[in-house]
Amino acid sequence: MKAKKTKRPRPKMPHASEEMKQWSAMLGNELSAWPQVKTRPMFGLRGFYRGRKIFAALPVTRAINNPNSLIFRIKPMPPGLLERAKKEPRIDTENRVPGAKWFLFELNSTADLRDALWWLNQAYDHAK
């Protein structure tokens, strides 16, 4: 008899909202213009890579946990930046998805795009 492998629960992948699709397109256009950035489709999202390292995923048809969220990866997150992330109400630092390497940023309006881009830039800088 085979031992049953324990699986991590899959993150919820709701449909991306229409607003989020527009915001993702705008953010994606900006990220695609950065040096060494390549994109690949990934489970209803578009993954953004700096060279071979993935640093972000933006919704195309699906989102992670929330219809208005994007995810970015900073591994390891420097302590000062982690403290800043913990103070940011739009970033979920408790339930990082999927796994501890990813952070979820929730957008509520176009005013959030500037801050989302700042965090995406941090992820890009740390993906060297």
Model-derived features: positions:
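Short, structured beta-strand-loop surface elements
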Residues: 74-128
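Short, Lys/Arg-enriched charge-dense amphipathic segments
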Residues: 19-26, 58-75, 114-128
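Short, conserved beta-strand/beta-arch hydrophobic-aromatic motifs that form part
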Residues: 41-96
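Charge-dense, low-complexity intrinsically disordered segments
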Residues: 14-18, 107-110
